[in-house]
A protein has these predicted regions:
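Short, structured active-site-proximal loop/turn typified by the sulfatase FGly-forming signature C/S-X-P-X-R
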Residues: 55-104, 164-168
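Active-site-proximal N-terminal segment of extracellular/periplasmic enzymes that hydrolyze or transfer
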Residues: 23-75
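Beta-strand elements within well-structured catalytic alpha/beta cores of enzymes
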Residues: 39-51, 70, 96, 155, ...
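Substrate-binding rim/cap in mid-to-C-terminal beta-strand-loop elements of soluble/periplasmic
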Residues: 386-425, 495-537, 554
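Short, solvent-exposed turn/loop segments enriched in Gly/Ser/Thr/Pro and often Arg
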Residues: 77-95, 167-175, 310-312, 361-364, ...
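Secreted, luminal/periplasmic, and some membrane-associated catalytic domains
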Residues: 62, 79, 88, 110-140, ...
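His/Asp/Glu-rich, glycine-adjacent segments
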Residues: 101, 109-303, 312-319, 440-442, ...
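Bacterial Sec-dependent N-terminal signal peptides
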Residues: 1-33
Length: 555
């Protein structure tokens, strides 16, 4: 990439936007736009399933160079929330980088029912592209289902594609959606018996040599080792007992207790995929991110590059072992060390004060409901099968037809419009009838129709969150809200997806060039991140952005 962004201008005189430096012009001359006031590299870090209280709960175990460095030298938004439902990985990553909600960017879940094809679709799935780096279908992915731009896209447009964008994550959606539509590359990890970083023909026809070399280096193999706690387990007083009834564990091991021999357990746990559910998946991601910076020469000139890194292992560990486990505590202690290692690398290769980082999460997580029950806190599990059977009987009795329902998924009901029309029924009346039926069901807290979502302007409460997550083209006809602390999940491990604070309240840290030192308890929302970074860079906001730049964060 060039050190200066070269533009051709005519008679006009321009003065710079604050972050772009000074522009000197003359008639029909080549103009050098100095961009040294902008960071050389923006790194977006998403920690999958990180609740805000993990920053404070494990604080005594963190070193000075990871999370604490961001807090002590950067800006801490202590009351940052997702402003929509559902709080899943796909929508979370899309919302962080596009500056808007599923209502606009269209990623309404990890998977959803497509009303046109009558099939379930995956948020990053794309059968029109081919896998690169594997013969497995795991590479048939792209960002095409995301309907708006990311700030990384806008940076590519602003720099005439001279600023690079690369996305990295163990999860495909965690790499693809943040990097946007114009990324140079997105890479994700394919486990099983391969243990390799792969991509898609959306970005390239073959892996670059540095990725091939990394895959051949046996980096993944090196982490198939014993996982034990970093410190003496007796000092892990911020979490529950190591042996309890609330954790899943790994196949091939009777108890979900330390230590874990990953090499031995890998055979019964999908080979290299076992790494995803350990902190070593985060370490491998860090290794690969640093290799990308070196090989792609990111941040080596004055034209801003963007690197998106999503740490997925925290989510896998949380789902498996739960919020209160020793395993989740050790995972965050180790992630803190990986962050310190990563920041030190950025200091050495980009230069201290020459890069900007933000760190947040794509959603939080609920405490294991069975654990909450043991603490006398109201919680439980949904019997979706029984609810669906009861509801289908109602529909058949009410409308004398068993084909009105096409799909039930993500707490939404999709109706068969063709059948409803053929019966001469009014769609709005059918929806409202179902709302009145479902609201009487046990463990259902609220129910809304698509008609209500599209004709009523909600500004507060779960209704506003649902509306921000409702996409008229893609969402269902009836939307259910389960009773608080009731989930559709196994009785071990944790999950997420609700509009409650345990799922919406996540960290938001800014650090590096152009960032003030401070903190705020004023409420901020996730869509504010992208326009804040855009304002820092002096570029256009993402085209669907509804967030507000956090001016108090920027110097």
């Amino acid at each position: 990439m060039k050190k200066f962004l070269v533009l051709t201008v005519f008679v006009f005189m321009f003065s710079s936007c604050g972050s772009q430096g000074q522009i000197v012009t003359s008639n029909v001359n080549t103009v050098e736009v100095k961009t040294s006031l902008r960071p050389k590299l923006v790194v977006g870090i998403v920690v999958d399933q990180m609740r805000y209280d993990y920053l404070t709960r494990f604080e005594s175990k963190y070193g000075e160079g990871g999370f604490k460095r961001m807090i002590n030298e950067g800006f801490n938004c202590k009351n940052s929330h997702f402003n929509y439902v559902p709080t899943y990985t796909g929508p979370g990553h899309a919302s962080i980088y596009t500056g808007t909600t599923p209502k606009n960017h269209g990623i309404i879940g990890n998977n959803w029912y497509d009303k046109t094809t009558k099939k379930m679709v995956y948020c990053a799935g794309d059968d029109s592209v081919e896998s690169v780096g594997t013969t497995n279908k795991a590479g048939k992915m792209s960002p095409r289902r995301m309907q708006t731009t990311s700030f990384a896209d806008e940076n590519r447009l602003f720099t005439q594609s001279q600023g690079k964008t690369i996305g990295i994550s163990l999860k495909d959606r965690g790499a693809i959606l943040p990097a946007g539509h114009t990324a140079n590359a997105a890479y994700w990890f394919h486990g099983r018996d391969e243990g390799a970083w792969i991509s898609s023909s959306f970005y390239m026809n073959e892996l670059p040599q540095w990725v091939l070399d990394f895959n051949k280096s046996e980096a993944a193999e090196s982490y198939l080792k014993v996982w034990n706690t970093v410190y003496d387990i007796s000092t892990y007083t911020e979490s529950g007992a190591d042996e309890n009834n609330f954790e899943g564990g790994f196949k091939g091991k009777d108890k979900a207790t330390f230590p874990y021999d990953l090499a031995a357990l890998s055979k019964e746990n999908r080979g290299f995929d076992i790494l995803k559910a350990t902190p070593y998946g985060n370490s491998l991601t860090t290794d690969f991110a640093m290799a990308a910076i070196k090989a792609e020469h990111l941040g080596q000139d004055d034209i801003t590059d963007v690197l998106t890194v999503s740490y997925s292992s925290t989510d896998y560990v949380g789902h498996n072992f739960g919020v209160n486990s020793k395993e989740i505590e050790d995972t965050y202690i180790r992630l803190d060390k990986d962050l310190e290692r990563f920041f030190n690398y950025l200091d050495a290769t980009i230069g201290t004060g020459e890069y900007t980082i933000f760190l947040t999460a794509d959603h939080g997580a609920i405490d294991v409901p069975s654990y909450l029950q043991s603490m006398n806190i109201p919680a439980g599990y949904l019997d979706n099968k029984a609810t669906k059977t009861k509801f289908e009987k109602y529909v058949e009795a009410k409308f004398k037809n068993s084909e009105l329902i096409e799909n039930v998924s993500n707490n939404q009901i999709f109706l068969n419009r063709t059948t409803i029309d053929s019966l001469g029924l009014n769609i709005n009346e059918v929806q409202e009838s179902m709302v009145n039926e479902l609201i009487a069901y046990k463990n259902v807290n609220k129910v809304f129709s698509a008609f209500t979502m599209t004709t009523t302007d909600f500004t507060t409460g779960i209704e506003a969150l649902l509306q921000n997550g409702y996409n008229q083209k893609r969402s269902g006809d009836v939307i259910l809200v389960p009773k608080s602390n009731y989930i559709s999940y196994s009785k071990t491990g944790s999950t997420h997806g609700s509009g409650l604070n345990h799922d919406t309240h996540v960290p938001l840290l800014f650090f590096g060039k152009g960032i003030k030192h401070g903190e705020t308890l004023n409420k901020t929302v996730i869509p504010d991140i992208a326009p804040t970074i855009s304002a820092l860079l002096g570029i256009s906001f993402p085209n669907g952005s509804t967030g507000i730049p956090l001016g108090f964060v920027i110097e």
